[in-house]
């Protein structure tokens, strides 16, 4: 399928919208009430610091809603305003934040049901309005909705679209796309649908396995056993690793993505030499500015003397998980929560350690003067961060 031609055709359809409906002022009040916070604004103005009795709060200097998320949420609100009575669907969570998605449900936005890991579009009919979320949708889903006669509102983040353009460039030049991402993440699923031949690597360890295989140090059966669910149909590691381009899920750790890019550049240089490098490796620049800024701010925050860290965001939010990873790697006692209600008045906290299920921990806030670092993922509203801080203040006063 010529995905580039399909996108171009879709963008010219009168049933497709990716620019909103000119109703920004009409929804501004609702967005402000639901998501913004005067407390967070004052903390920003005070050098990202709040001192309250024995509690000292240190906010990361970049956190929370990025402009791509703000755009997607605003477009969803505009869509409901523009189509007040039409049946309105969204193909997935608009962003990875439970409170935002709950607000959409309250606006009678229906989420495409998922049965055994497969989306069920059987209830979607001609004339329905369907929102594509911030991290996009697969080209097959777009094609299905277009053929069904739906009105499509595309809130895909432009940074994600940039990655799609990158893998389409790889495909056009018959390069295999090495995608740094999580195989089942919605963004990576969408990106791979626009690619030709592709292989998804989770981290530097998996990238090293691929690099070793390219240089002749690997077993084909073992390789395919590991990557069989992370590659394009018919992928052949003996043929499809000769020409590589690198792309990434925009919410992955920036430093790791850069290391993976350098690893494959060195690998292809070693195999093919400097004169042929450009024929076998395509450099890339698909790292999202907002993701980079939040990670950089987190690295700065963990340099401060902190007693503990609270990271706020959806448990399925990749960028939030990576912020938690930064704190853990620095040896800081850190808690990933998705809602303020995870912090209880009895000084316990329900949180999700890296790679584990939810656990409850007692004696969350220590006695005496305590310095708490706080950050939040790109899908977390300031209002949610405010409510977390209010709970911390209450705990510091009562315990």
From Swiss-Prot:
Presence of keyword GTP-binding: no
Residues the record lists as binding dimethylallyl diphosphate: 96, 185, 317-319, 379
Record field: catalytic activity: isopentenyl diphosphate + 2 oxidized [2Fe-2S]-[ferredoxin] + H2O = (2E)-4-hydroxy-3-methylbut-2-enyl diphosphate + 2 reduced [2Fe-2S]-[ferredoxin] + 2 H(+); dimethylallyl diphosphate + 2 oxidized [2Fe-2S]-[ferredoxin] + H2O = (2E)-4-hydroxy-3-methylbut-2-enyl diphosphate + 2 reduced [2Fe-2S]-[ferredoxin] + 2 H(+)
Pfam family name, one: LYTB
Pathway: Isoprenoid biosynthesis; dimethylallyl diphosphate biosynthesis; dimethylallyl diphosphate from (2E)-4-hydroxy-3-methylbutenyl diphosphate: step 1/1; Isoprenoid biosynthesis; isopentenyl diphosphate biosynthesis via DXP pathway; isopentenyl diphosphate from 1-deoxy-D-xylulose 5-phosphate: step 6/6
Keywords: 4Fe-4S, Iron, Iron-sulfur, Isoprene biosynthesis, Metal-binding, Oxidoreductase
Cofactor note: Binds 1 [4Fe-4S] cluster per subunit.
Cofactor(s) the record lists: [4Fe-4S] cluster
Binding site for (2E)-4-hydroxy-3-methylbut-2-enyl diphosphate: 96, 185, 250, 317-319, 379
Active site, per annotation: 187 (proton donor)
Binding positions ([4Fe-4S] cluster): 66, 157, 288
InterPro entries membership: LytB/IspH (IPR003451)
A single MF term (Gene Ontology): 4-hydroxy-3-methylbut-2-enyl diphosphate reductase activity
NCBIfam families noted in UniProt: ispH_lytB (TIGR00216), PRK13371.1 (NF009911)
Sequence similarity: Belongs to the IspH family.
PANTHER family, per the entry: 4-HYDROXY-3-METHYLBUT-2-ENYL DIPHOSPHATE REDUCTASE, CHLOROPLASTIC (PTHR31619:SF5)
Function noted in UniProt: Catalyzes the conversion of 1-hydroxy-2-methyl-2-(E)-butenyl 4-diphosphate (HMBPP) into a mixture of isopentenyl diphosphate (IPP) and dimethylallyl diphosphate (DMAPP). Acts in the terminal step of the DOXP/MEP pathway for isoprenoid precursor biosynthesis.
Protein name in the entry: 4-hydroxy-3-methylbut-2-enyl diphosphate reductase
Organism encoding this protein: Synechococcus sp. (strain WH7803)
